């Protein structure tokens, strides 16, 4: 059969709330069986999490990210598992050859998220201002395509898209309409951690370059690219757990110590980034071991 096929049968939806953390699998058709979807309206804010190439929603870093969100604030976390279309289940030696197929599936998965969003807004009265998307690697571009589609559907913009080391291959030379772009949400936050698998391009309202966006500390010399690429997910979970864990310094002032940061010019990575006035590119020094925080207890 075709490799890495996308259709609504090859995607699963995992929903987590404080009351219901059991990570059961749902589809668009069975969503209404979930306790949260039996309500007339859903009042809590929603975060979608989308994984990347050859990964899945049950990979431990994504489980930890979802848990951090549910623990931190009363979010409903919707994890999109598109592992089949991301080539996760193809023969190990061959799956990398199918990357272009997975890359082209990102638009379809994004449209699928937009369909779920339409249901949330129309049937459950959720405001778009209460929905944000977090996507890693190819999942960052999935989130961008979802952001384009909801605007086509006249739903407005998502409040935020967080792109965790958006994938470089197949996307780097693309026009805005063919990749994650800063117009895809009210606020687009990009975390750069690698420069081969991930892009170095400025894509967002704010772009954070962790350790200059490559060779992240603690990743070693070998396989450091894959390790650095994955670090983006780990850093985001820590930034949700610890307020102002990672502070970004404007790249124009990257020699300045974090201790001199003010909330006018520096920005805390994470869910509160958009509350800071500063925009553009930021340098983020990172410690080599968890929780990786650079703020030495300082909160701006």
From Swiss-Prot:
Main location: secreted
Catalysis: reaction(s): a 1,2-diacyl-sn-glycero-3-phosphocholine + H2O = a 2-acyl-sn-glycero-3-phosphocholine + a fatty acid + H(+)
Catalytic residues, chain numbering: 137 (nucleophile), 165 (charge relay system), 229 (charge relay system)
Tissue: Expressed by the venom gland.
One GO MF term attached to the UniProt entry: phospholipase A1 activity
GO biological process: lipid catabolic process
Keyword set includes Hydrolase: yes
Superkingdom classification of source: Eukaryota
Keywords of this entry: Allergen, Disulfide bond, Hydrolase, Lipid degradation, Lipid metabolism, Secreted
GO cellular component, one term: extracellular space
Subcellular localization, as worded in the UniProt entry: Secreted
Disulfide bonds: 4-87, 176-181, 219-227, 244-268, 245-293, 261-266
EC number: 3.1.1.32
Database matches in InterPro entries: AB_hydrolase_fold, Allerg_PlipaseA1, Lipase, Lipase_N, TAG_lipase
Known function: Catalyzes the hydrolysis of phosphatidylcholine with phospholipase A1 activity. May act as an allergen and induce hemolytic activity.
Family label: Belongs to the AB hydrolase superfamily. Lipase family.
Protein name: Phospholipase A1
Lineage: Eukaryota, Metazoa, Ecdysozoa, Arthropoda, Hexapoda
């Amino acid at each position: 059969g075709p490799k890495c096929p996308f259709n609504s049968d090859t995607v699963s939806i995992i929903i987590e709330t404080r009351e219901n953390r059991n990570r059961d699998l749902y589809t668009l058709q069975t969503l209404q069986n979930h306790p949260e979807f039996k309500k007339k309206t859903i009042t809590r804010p929603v975060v979608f999490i989308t994984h990347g190439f050859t990964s899945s929603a049950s990979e431990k870093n994504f489980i930890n990210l979802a848990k951090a969100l549910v623990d931190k604030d009363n979010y409903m976390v919707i994890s999109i598992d598109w592992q089949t279309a991301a080539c996760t289940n193809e023969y190990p030696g061959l799956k990398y050859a199918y990357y272009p197929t997975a890359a082209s599936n990102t638009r379809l998965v994004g449209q699928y998220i937009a369909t779920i969003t339409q249901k949330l807004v129309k049937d459950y009265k959720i405001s778009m201002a209460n929905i944000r998307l977090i996507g890693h690697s190819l999942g960052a571009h999935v989130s961008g395509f979802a952001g384009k589609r909801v605007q086509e559907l006249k739903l407005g913009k998502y409040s935020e898209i967080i792109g965790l080391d958006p994938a470089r291959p197949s996307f780097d030379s693309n026009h805005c309409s063919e990749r994650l772009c800063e117009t895809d949400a009210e606020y687009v936050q990009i975390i750069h951690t690698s420069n081969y698998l991930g892009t170095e391009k400025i894509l967002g309202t704010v772009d954070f370059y962790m350790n200059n966006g490559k060779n992240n500390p603690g990743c070693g010399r070998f396989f450091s690219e894959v390790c650095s690429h994955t670090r983006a997910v780990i850093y985001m979970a820590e930034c949700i757990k610890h307020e102002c864990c990672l502070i970004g310094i404007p790249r124009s002032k990257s020699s300045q110590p974090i201790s001199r940061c003010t909330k006018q010019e520096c920005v805390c990575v994470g869910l509160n980034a958009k509350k800071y006035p500063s925009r553009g590119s930021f340098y983020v020094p990172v410690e080599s071991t968890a929780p990786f925080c650079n703020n030495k207890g300082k909160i701006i």
